[in-house]
Design a protein with these regions (language model features):
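C-terminal motif of bacterial Sec signal peptides marking the signal peptidase cleavage site
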Residues: 13-15
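Bacterial signal peptide processing site
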Residues: 17-19
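Post-signal peptide N-terminal segment of mature Sec-exported envelope proteins
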Residues: 24-49
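Structural signature of tandem alpha-helical TPR/SEL1-like repeats
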Residues: 28, 59-67, 92-102, 126-132
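Short helix-capping/linker turns of helical repeat alpha-solenoids
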Residues: 39-46, 53-57, 61, 74-82, ...
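Terminal, low-structured helical/coil segments at or just beyond the last alpha-helical repeat
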Residues: 127-165
Length: 165
């Protein structure tokens, strides 16, 4: 049950990026936005595949997830791609400075999970900055609505870093 709640929270918190083209056009209707719609569908597909691979855990999928996230990053306006790229780096015990940079870029776009994880990652090295990110989280619309709390967001982010297998 806990695993399903985590997965549902992951998909719900995945981010709602706004797009400048009409993405509601059906495939059989001619539209001037068809290239934009195709690009948006590919972006959504890349993000979904990458999130599923990351949430499944294991290092087998990391390389493909990384490639999908890099391709999706060019269209991402929500900070979601940077957040998941940082998760992969943290999970691999890779370059922490690069992971922090990716999280900061995602935080600038108000990605809630990135802000929570950034506050946690900076807690030991820069407590003042970590506290500022925690305060920034409290100012997000999603936090003001009561769901998810900072602790719940950390639980989801930590679950991505060390997935339950």
């Amino acid at each position: 049950m806990n695993k399903w709640m985590f997965f549902c929270a992951l998909l719900c918190l995945g981010g709602c990026a706004s797009h400048r083209c009409d993405t509601s056009t059906r495939y059989d209707e001619p539209s001037g936005d068809s290239l934009c719609r195709s690009a948006h569908l590919l972006y959504q597909n890349d993000m979904l595949q990458a999130k599923l691979m990351i949430s499944a855990g294991g290092s087998d999928n990391s390389e493909l997830a990384k490639a999908l996230l890099e391709r999706a990053a060019s269209q991402d306006r929500s900070g979601e791609a940077e957040f998941y790229q940082a998760v992969l780096l943290i999970r691999a015990n890779s370059d922490n400075a690069e992971a922090i940079d990716l999280l900061e870029r995602a935080a600038k776009r108000n990605h809630p999970l990135a802000i929570a994880l950034l506050a946690q990652q900076l807690a030991s090295s820069d407590a003042k900055k970590a506290e500022q990110y925690r305060a920034n989280y409290a100012d997000l619309d999603v936090a003001k609505s009561g769901y998810p709390s900072f602790e719940q967001a950390l639980h989801v982010a930590n679950g991505l870093i060390t997935p339950v297998l």
